[in-house]
């Protein structure tokens, strides 16, 4: 089990295993958020909320981006469609030693027309 949290600790994330790779996307929203995404099936992720997350949608509105209402850290994204078997956690919330072992995949989301705003 690997655990991470937002800055204030009121949103905690537990995943079954450390990510082997993370995605650094440069689309308009990921670039602004400064996230590294690690992807998991939702059943392998546990989100513990001491305060509710705030959500944001844009573009095709297929994802909810979650952030801590207290400290503002982007914590994860979840699909609008519950049948979609993938979600992303902000790997920057994991311990640095866990993140250091992950391979970084650079995704040119800025060149994909669906990710611009």
Predicted regions and their residues:
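A short Gly-Trp-Pro
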Residues: 1-5, 10-117
């Amino acid at each position: 089990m690997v655990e991470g949290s937002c800055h204030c600790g009121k949103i905690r994330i537990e995943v079954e295993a450390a990510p082997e790779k993370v995605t650094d996307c440069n689309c308009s929203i990921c670039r602004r958020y400064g996230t590294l995404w690690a992807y998991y099936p939702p059943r392998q992720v546990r989100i513990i909320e001491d305060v509710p997350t705030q959500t944001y949608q844009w573009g095709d509105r297929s994802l909810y981006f979650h952030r801590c209402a207290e400290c503002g850290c982007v914590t994860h994204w979840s699909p609008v469609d519950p049948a979609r078997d993938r979600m992303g956690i902000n790997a920057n919330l994991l311990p640095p030693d866990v993140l250091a072992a992950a391979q970084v995949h650079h995704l040119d989301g800025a060149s994909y027309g669906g990710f611009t705003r």
